[in-house]
Regions:
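Aromatic "clamp/platform" in nucleotide-sugar-dependent glycosyltransferases that forms part
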Residues: 95-96
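Short alpha-helical segment that forms part of, or immediately flanks, the ligand-binding pocket
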Residues: 82, 104-109, 123
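A short alpha->beta transition loop at the rim of the catalytic pocket in nucleotide-sugar-dependent
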Residues: 89, 109-111
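A charged, aromatic-enriched C-terminal amphipathic alpha-helix characteristic of glycosyltransferases
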Residues: 150-181
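A short, active-site helix/loop in glycosyltransferases that binds the activated sugar's phosphate group
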Residues: 1-15, 56
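Conserved donor-binding/catalytic core segment of Leloir-type glycosyltransferases
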Residues: 16-20, 24-49, 55
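Short hydrophobic beta-strand element within catalytic cores of glycosyltransferases
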Residues: 112-116
Length: 182
């Protein structure tokens, strides 16, 4: 088993989705209706997430008044993550590796717009509502997301439904049960 779809290119295996408490994250207050979109990036590993390029582009957009950028200076304690996601309209996860992780799942379950590198995921889960980006195109992707604000509600719902389908634990339990019973 592999926990992220990008690993399937390196080994024979089956995707075993990571598990979050989808209903807990869905209980976070509805996305704020900020006049200026609030964008959150809280990397666990800055190099693997492409944070240098993300910071550079998002600071330019913040200076231009297009967004408000939340960027914790250090790794965020798990207890603080819900309040940061609650304040955000858009969450940017990793842009370097073609996979998404816990932060993306939490943000999707909370009905936030998520941007990340989904290169490998598109091959096996094309319905994933994460906006694809890499460091080279993050500025244009952010502009596209901001310009399509009318779609945010339906995209937030799609994110919630995606996490409910793949990350609430039932699919993972079913796959593990089948494996353990064989």
């Amino acid at each position: 088993f592999v926990t992220t779809p990008d690993l399937l290119q390196y080994t024979r295996g089956e995707w075993l989705p990571l598990v979050i408490d989808v209903e807990y994250w869905n209980s976070i207050d509805a996305r704020p209706n900020n006049a200026i979109p609030t964008v959150l990036h809280m990397p666990t590993n800055s190099k693997l997430k492409g944070s240098q390029q993300i910071d550079s582009e998002l600071m330019k957009l913040e200076t231009a008044g297009k967004i408000r950028y939340i960027r914790p200076e250090k790794k965020v304690a798990a207890s603080l993550v819900p309040s940061l996601i609650e304040k955000s309209d858009i969450v940017i996860d990793g842009l370097v590796i073609g996979a998404y992780g816990v932060t993306s799942c939490q943000a999707m379950a909370a009905r936030r717009i998520v941007i990340g590198n989904t290169n490998e995921l598109g091959k096996i889960r094309p319905e994933c509502p994460i906006f694809h980006s890499d460091p080279a195109i993050i500025s244009s992707v952010i502009h596209d997301v901001i310009d399509n604000r009318d779609a945010w509600k339906s995209l937030g719902e799609a994110g919630y439904q995606f996490t409910k389908k793949y990350h609430d634990g039932s699919l993972t339990a079913s796959k593990l049960s089948g494996f353990l019973d064989s």
